[in-house]
Amino acid sequence: MSCQPFTSADTFIPLNSESSATLPLIMHHSAAECLPASNHATNVMSTATGLHYSVPSCHYGNQPSTYGVMAGSLTPCLYKFPDHTLSHGFPPMYQPLLPEDPTAADFKQELRRKSKLVEEPIDMDSPEIRELEKFPNEFKVRRIKLGYTQTNVGEALAAVHGSEFSQTTICRFENLQLSFKNACKLKAILSKWLEEAEQVGALYNEKVGANERKRKRRTTISIAAKDALERHFGEQNKPSSQEILRMAEELNLEKEVVRVWFCNRRQREKRVKTSLNQSLFTISKEHLECR
């Protein structure tokens, strides 16, 4: 097909008109816009009756390919768009269709900031790292001093913070086998637990100490009271509870003091008898050897 340049605008006859069946389709382009026929145009030429010229594919002139929405998937047009519609009809695709949401912008900035923080290397000589390396050993010593095992600590933390804490977690923390992030998180929790445990332990030791001081308090028994107790012991070395109460009232002593005195007196009597029997046995044995 030879191309003839025209200065006027392009003219065309649509294929769906009544005269398209008898008249050939004549399209005129400028010499610079002539393109080889496409496969689609060849198919149209073979199927249309009375069409004796190959039809060139649609050419959008200077229009970028991004302007045509799904241009690659659409069938080529059989006419040429005017230049003014191609250059002024559509906005550039690289411009945002909607204004950017400020919330989304803030989210992106926060995401970039967090990614930078993660990528920053950890200073191994920082005071935080040194404290994190020293605390596990200190925690272990104080935990053992309070009488708690790793299992006790894991169960106590699991009851408050969930099942993610266990004996294995405490063991790995004390052996410096956790990641930096998890170790920092667990250090804060264990510090608080240790303070509470030491407070409870201090209260318990205070109560136990008071009970021990009360138990170790000794009662002084007068000589007259001892003589009276010795006489009662000679008569009955195992008095009943009523007899002990009566003796305590007579001697102006506590019932527990009288009861303990009789217990100690029986033990001393038993030791004396045992020692005496051993002495007699030794004497008898020596006497037999002399014979």
UniProtKB/Swiss-Prot annotation:
Cellular location(s): Nucleus
InterPro entries in alphabetical order: HD, Homeobox_CS, Homeodomain-like_sf, Lambda_DNA-bd_dom_sf, POU, POU_dom, POU_domain_TF
GO BP of this protein: positive regulation of transcription by RNA polymerase II; regulation of transcription by RNA polymerase II
Coiled coil location: none
Main location class: nucleus
A single GO cellular-component term on record: nucleus
SUPFAM superfamilies named in the record: Homeodomain-like (SSF46689), lambda repressor-like DNA-binding domains (SSF47413)
POU-specific domain location: 124-198
GO molecular function: DNA-binding transcription factor activity, RNA polymerase II-specific; RNA polymerase II cis-regulatory region sequence-specific DNA binding
Keyword Lipoprotein included in the entry's annotation: no
Motif (9aaTAD): 5-13
Domain of life assignment: Eukaryota
Entries under Pfam families matching the protein: Homeodomain, Pou
Alphabetical UniProt keywords: Activator, DNA-binding, Homeobox, Nucleus, Transcription, Transcription regulation
Portion annotated as DNA-binding: 214-273
Functional summary from the UniProt entry: Transcription factor involved in the specification of the lactotrope, somatotrope, and thyrotrope phenotypes in the developing anterior pituitary. Activates growth hormone and prolactin genes. Specifically binds to the consensus sequence 5'-TAAAT-3'.
Family the entry assigns: Belongs to the POU transcription factor family. Class-1 subfamily.
Domain notes: The 9aaTAD motif is a transactivation domain present in a large number of yeast and animal transcription factors.
Name of this chain's protein: Pituitary-specific positive transcription factor 1
Source organism per UniProt: Sus scrofa
Gene giving rise to this polypeptide: POU1F1
